[in-house]
């Protein structure tokens, strides 16, 4: 388990950590997100405007499936609405920044 410093304090994280940010004052900077996900940050914009931040190379690194983030993914990107991506999954630590909490990441 590792620790990372985010605006809401220092967190101990494991591979299945799923953090939800819903306040602009808690929006993390890139370095903190990179530390949290353990590498390069991939940003996925959800149809409702929320952003999911995860490790871009997580699958190549063999990170374990993140059950909470994968559940959100499968509930959002359903087969009836999306030709691809509906059967995908999220691995490693992930952060969801709610649309109303976006500041820096929205640019």
Language-model features: locations:
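Short beta-rich binding modules
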Residues: 1-107
């Amino acid at each position: 388990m590792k620790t990372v410093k985010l605006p809401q304090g220092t967190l101990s994280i494991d591979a299945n950590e799923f953090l939800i940010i819903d306040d602009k004052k808690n929006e993390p900077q890139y370095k903190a997100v990179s530390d949290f996900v353990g590498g390069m940050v991939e940003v996925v914009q959800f149809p409702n405007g929320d952003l999911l931040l995860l490790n871009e190379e997580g699958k190549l690194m063999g990170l374990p499936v993140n059950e909470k983030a994968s559940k959100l993914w499968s509930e959002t990107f359903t087969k009836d609405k999306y030709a691809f991506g509906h059967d995908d999954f999220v691995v490693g630590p992930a952060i969801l920044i709610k649309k109303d909490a976006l500041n820096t990441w929205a640019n």
